[in-house]
Regions:
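Helix-start/capping segments and mature chain N-termini
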Residues: 1-72, 76, 87, 92-273
Length: 273
């Protein structure tokens, strides 16, 4: 892993130990696919980053500065993952951010995970996502529910897990959005109360390939096919959820083909990582 840290436009040797992102999760982040030294989904990630910074009232560095440094870190990397972490900086008394310093941010380049060889094996997670409309949709740094849910997935030896809100409505996987095929239509749960609005989910909605609709556990289990999507993996088929199995479905191939036409990086084998 290689990383670079900044305060505003000034490069730092590292993040301050008093950084509010480390202390309180006071920040937002983006996890981006690198392909051929470029960041094909950068414009979409920047939109979500801006929205997260706006909601948390964190001053965002200049777009051109962010992009130039991100592109510099990604350059020369054929296939990888770039994480951009933006925090409020350091300072303030306790939770108060009144005297916080200028925003601090970090870029870290990671290898692309190994490709998955089979359809994903999923479990239901018992850890619920809390309802908080003020934070719903953005990728803020407080991810403890996802950490706990992922521990359940690891204990079960599964690839991923589905999480629900406190009312039992299905929200997403721990690190991906959920796609459910019913009656010839691909559906995805609403995210106005909790969850992360993935940039790839956003593209699918804008392209008219997916529709937002509330989904219960029973509705998910009654689906004709399931898939997960995120900006690093692309779209992946689900083969099993608990005791329910799904064979390959032609609608999944059609959906993935549409995505690959728009973003060829997701047609490559490592897109299944």
């Amino acid at each position: 892993m290689s990383a670079r840290c900044f305060r505003g436009n000034t490069e730092l040797a590292g993040l301050d130990p008093a950084n509010r992102g480390l202390a309180y999760g006071d920040g937002v982040f983006e996890t981006m696919r690198v392909h051929g030294g470029e960041l094909p989904l950068w414009p979409r990630h920047l939109v979500r980053l801006r929205e997260g910074a706006r909601r948390l009232a964190i001053p965002l560095p200049d777009d051109a500065v962010l992009q130039s440094h991100a592109e510099a870190v990604a350059a020369g990397c054929e296939a990888g993952v770039l994480k951009l972490l933006l925090t409020r900086g350091s300072g303030g008394r306790g939770y108060s951010a009144a005297s916080a310093t200028e925003a601090e941010w970090m870029l870290a380049l990671h290898p692309l995970p190994a490709a998955a060889s089979d359809a994903l094996q999923l479990v239901w997670c018992d850890t619920p996502l809390p309802v908080q409309p003020l934070l719903a949709g953005i990728k803020h740094c407080n991810r403890l529910e996802q950490v706990l849910a992922r521990m359940e997935v690891d204990r079960a030896g599964a690839d991923e897990g589905l999480v629900c809100d406190a009312d039992g409505q299905v929200v997403s996987a721990t690190a991906a959005n959920l796609l459910v095929l019913r009656g010839g239509r691909w559906l995805t749960p609403p995210l106005e109360r909790c969850g992360v609005a993935g940039v790839l989910r956003g593209w699918l909605l804008e392209a008219g390939l997916v529709t937002v609709e509330p989904l219960s556990r029973d509705a998910v289990l009654a689906a004709d096919a399931l898939a997960l999507c995120n900006a690093v993996r692309g779209i992946l088929p689900v083969g099993r959820l608990g005791d329910r199995n799904w064979p390959p479905h032609p609608s999944f191939d059609e959906l993935k083909a549409r995505l690959s036409m728009a973003y060829p990086m997701f047609s490559r084998p490592e897109a299944a990582a």
